[in-house]
Amino acid sequence: MPTHLLCRRSHKPRPTLPLTEGIALDLARVHEACGPARHSFALWLAAAAQGPVLWLSQPQAGRPLNPAQAARPLNPDGIAEYASPSRFLFVQTARAEDLLWAMEEALRGGGAALVVAELAEPPAMTPVRRLHLAAEAGGTFGPAPAGLLLTPGQGGAQGIESRWHLAPAHGLPPPSSSLPGCGAASRECWTLQRLRARTLPPRSWHITRARAGGPLQAAPLPPGAACQQTARPAASRVLPQPQSPLAAPALP
């Protein structure tokens, strides 16, 4: 029986969702974001996407076990700095299984440009594979969607297309004199790490953004610089007070 070693499918470049210069995420795939600023990473992608954004969560996923903070959506005032709140649809589910099912159906339908899922722990391999297939099917008759899993800690979802770690660096000096400063009155700064990707090596960037708004600016970091920044003790960091909190205020 003959064996075909070459694939007959065309190897067209996969469409991507550009975040900033030199940083892009493949569409029709599911990615993972972790780290203390992972919600900001999701909002960056939402700003770059063209179309509705579906945000799925559980009452306590990724949030402290505090009844006052349970089932609280993102603050529209904080979202408005990145994208119009009218583009967002928030859905909460009681179980992680229901959340993954809703994400799969949303990706397959292709109606949302970006589907974000907040999880209390990384999912197993089988659900992630199903999400990839659903995202590919969602681009059959139109632009392909992208999926993003928000997981605590260092992440660890199996089978994802890429894993990203984002941490704030607002009060830290830039690792190089050639990089923009992070003054509290002028710019916000983050350290972005690509921990893994199917076709790209690990890499780190120094991300800055003007507090008055505007595009993200990225500068590559030398190997090991990101680990030194994230490993600094919290007492040495002088973090500015957030001007627009992402969490909505508690109801009286």
What are these regions (language model features)?
Residues R95, A120-T126:
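Acidic, metal-coordinating catalytic cores used for nucleic-acid/nucleotide bond scission
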